[in-house]
Amino acid sequence: MLIILTGLPGVGKSTFSKNLAKILSKNNIDVIVLGSDLIRESFPVWKEKYEEFIKKSTYRLIDSALKNYWVIVDDTNYYNSMRRDLINIAKKYNKNYAIIYLKASLDVLIRRNIERGEKIPNEVIKKMYEKFDEPGKKYKWDEPFLIIDTTKDIDFNEIAKKLIEKSKEIPKFYVLEENKNKNNNISDKIDKETRKIVSEYIKSKKLDKDKIKEVVELRKEFLKKIKKMEEVDADRVLKEFKDLLNSY
């Protein structure tokens, strides 16, 4: 069984996944929690060039573990394309999957982020909130099995019971919509990578709120310009954005 968590930073995914795993384990379920942070935090420092390796390694771990165990994916998975890639792994082994959508208001996410020492710049969380692909809004296969408000009490025993029942069903897979336009994939990559570049830049420069807003706006205008281009080379564009930021 593949359990795909989706939700923004500060919503409580890691706490949720650990608590759920404990309850499932008490029900004699062999379960493992996996996510990109497991690998990302193994690097002593973060560099943008590591991200492709981190993504591929995370997927390989999930792919390998799903053969024998239940897997809880502890990641934001905020684009439906990310959730689709994970569902394809479940499909590969004919395993059931369940998307669990963890929700909280933007105010709560920001407050929690501040309480943990602003691990991620608040402006980045706000942008992710705006860009978030809400599960089930566009595709049938993307509909959440459960929607959880993490500001309320959570009954993990009841959630575990529902997941165990679902795991006994015959897996059903809808036709997954693929990105027909290559530029959509490139745009997703550029959007994600420039977000990371900005996040790292803000952290390294220790910018104040006004400067953060300026940098976020700079990225926004840069992406508008890129969207007007017919042919886009992602690597060249990312280098151009880094140069722009460094000269700012």
From Swiss-Prot:
Keyword Transferase listed: yes
Record-listed E.C. numbers: 2.7.1.164
Catalytic activity: L-seryl-tRNA(Sec) + ATP = O-phospho-L-seryl-tRNA(Sec) + ADP
InterPro entries: KTI12/PSTK (IPR013641), L-seryl-tRNA_Sec_kinase_arc (IPR020024), P-loop_NTPase (IPR027417), Ser-tRNA(Sec)_kinase (IPR052648)
Top EC class for this record: transferase
Family to which the UniProt record says this protein belongs: Belongs to the L-seryl-tRNA(Sec) kinase family.
Function, in words: Specifically phosphorylates seryl-tRNA(Sec) to O-phosphoseryl-tRNA(Sec), an activated intermediate for selenocysteine biosynthesis.
Name of this protein: L-seryl-tRNA(Sec) kinase
Gene that encodes it: pstK
